[in-house]
Amino acid sequence: MRTILPGGEPFFFLGNSGIGCLLLHGLTSAPQEMRGLGEYLAARGHTVLGLRLPAHATRPRAMLHTHWEDWLAAAEDGYHLLENNVRQVIVLGLSLGGAIGLLLASSRPVVGVVAMSTPYEVPPQPRLRFLKALLQPLALLGRVIPFLPKPPPMDYRDREAARNHLTYPVMPVRAITETARLLAVMRARLAEVRVPVLLMHSIHDGGVSPANARSIYEQLGSAQKQLLWLENSGHVLTVEPAHRQVYESAAGFVERWSQPAREGLGEPDEGAATRPRRRASLGR
């Protein structure tokens, strides 16, 4: 009997650069959405570990018994596995994975973090902020109605990518409340993140408002932080038409801030990421 969905398997690529890249996927999704980025980094000689977060890529019911600490513990396991085989570790995460990466960086000596489409709070859309007051009742409701229907994704620029994206067809209520708890801890620790951080976010993200990226950027304790806005993409940056720009920017960041890369690969292209800029549409 197969328990992990096809495409939900973790992946590992052994490199020779001395750099380890820990890749973390998003909520109710799977390692599949990070694999292309992982293969790109591996082709540049880096060791890559793409984790499957607990209760993901199996069945939605597995989420009903999972806590946010389980997700963080899995990322910590991945960090320790890598650090035993490389000289430096960088975390790259999408959505929930980005939040976990930032949280990990507040307590572990990672070299840097690439956080893509990362939420600052739940709900991650300003127009839904009135729902914050419902989080506690929602946790109680989850005992009676464990799943909520997911609306069809509307922000994809690549419809084939939308069809092929491996994710649960429903949203476990428990996953929402646990994500809210994780993000509360992340917000409290952002000032403790002192390593370089690259934030990437689409200005068309329909799942996590771009305002989330601005809030994270402003509260990070790091002196080396960048915010790259993407045009031709929706929420899942790694599979959209802009994915090549995402891959190149991530690799440039990895190779800029890791000493083994500077020794062996030379200086990266300074144009790999842009300085943060204000957009009138972001708001707070």
Please provide the spans of the model-predicted regions.
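Active-site nucleophile loop of the alpha/beta-hydrolase fold
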Residues: 114-123
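Gly/Ala-rich beta-loop-alpha elbow adjacent to hydrolase catalytic centers
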Residues: 93-97, 101
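Catalytic active-site module of serine/aspartate enzymes centered on a nucleophile-bearing elbow/loop
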Residues: 231-284
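Active-site nucleophile elbow and catalytic-triad environment of alpha/beta-hydrolase enzymes
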Residues: 6-8, 172-190
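Short, surface-exposed "cap/lid" segments of acyl-processing enzymes
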Residues: 3-59
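Short alpha-helix in the alpha/beta-hydrolase fold that links the catalytic acid
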Residues: 37, 195, 209-218
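Catalytic histidine neighborhood in serine/cysteine hydrolases
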Residues: 214, 218-236
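Short beta-strand/loop motif that positions the catalytic acidic residue
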Residues: 193, 199-201, 205
